[in-house]
Amino acid sequence: MKKMILIAGPCVIESKDLIFKVAEQLKNFNENPNIEFYFKSSFDKANRTSINSFRGPGLEEGLKILQSVKDEFGMKILTDIHESNQAAAVSEVADVLQIPAFLCRQTDLLVAAAKTKAKVNIKKGQFLNPSDIKYSVKKVLQTRGIEDEGYEAAQKNGVFVAERGASFGYGNLVVDMRSLVIMREFAPVIFDATHSVQMPGAAGGSSGGKSEFVEPLARAAAAVGIDGFFFETHINPCEALCDGPNMLNLTRLKNCVNTLLEIQNIIKENK
């Protein structure tokens, strides 16, 4: 049976202590034979609403902490890059380089990521027609010398795409489940269940969110039939330094993931 991709971890590296506490609680997913697990956290949140918002420890210290997670827990690592000159250094630690949604069309960034040995996760911009994500995927594939396109070509060459909602007026996002089907023509699809419930700028200088919708939307995405899920999670989301309002509490993640595995099995059995 094909493994379900699961990407999970705190939004940003708040401290090594917190990262290790979260990783300790996520290690069972890493040991699950039905899950392809990636630990996620950011060394720098370069697109915060306010200049006063916490951004993280920065590249050098952040990579040291992520490497320590890899060494201690044997986990694969996913983290995002915001500038082309970060790609090579980050790929020495990260197994997956994530392209932020706002930057999903930035050719230089995509090319820099493609030139590394890492897989590439492209988050679809909140502004983007889902069918247009194929052009971002092609930038990575063609940089890697791959002229073929479509799901199989992307899967074989370590490229996947993530849905994280579409702008719906000011300060709100909605999820069009049709986009999951459309994007899966071009690459394996990850559903970012936590950013999809974000309310950009709604907290006055920072983003709000509706975390009560994380699990229902994840279940709906699983029923569509996709490749994996992305959850930002925290021991205490109310105290998180970034994206707390849309995070899923660690205490809820296990049951949520088990439900998603059950739904995926039903979908596979009935195809």
UniProtKB/Swiss-Prot annotation:
A GO biological process held by the record: keto-3-deoxy-D-manno-octulosonic acid biosynthetic process
Protein name as catalogued: 2-dehydro-3-deoxyphosphooctonate aldolase
Family membership: Belongs to the KdsA family.
Keyword S-adenosyl-L-methionine in record: no
Endpoints of the signal sequence: none
Substrates-to-products reaction catalysed: D-arabinose 5-phosphate + phosphoenolpyruvate + H2O = 3-deoxy-alpha-D-manno-2-octulosonate-8-phosphate + phosphate
PANTHER family recorded: PHOSPHO-2-DEHYDRO-3-DEOXYHEPTONATE ALDOLASE
Pfam families per the UniProt record, alphabetical: DAHP_synth_1 (PF00793)
GO cellular component, one term: cytoplasm
Functional pathway: Carbohydrate biosynthesis; 3-deoxy-D-manno-octulosonate biosynthesis; 3-deoxy-D-manno-octulosonate from D-ribulose 5-phosphate: step 2/3; Bacterial outer membrane biogenesis; lipopolysaccharide biosynthesis
Keyword Transferase: yes
Organism per entry: Campylobacter jejuni subsp. jejuni serotype O:6 (strain 81116 / NCTC 11828)
Cellular compartments annotated: Cytoplasm
Name of the top EC class for this enzyme: transferase
A GO MF label: 3-deoxy-8-phosphooctulonate synthase activity
Enzyme nomenclature, EC number: 2.5.1.55
Keyword annotations: Cytoplasm, Lipopolysaccharide biosynthesis, Transferase
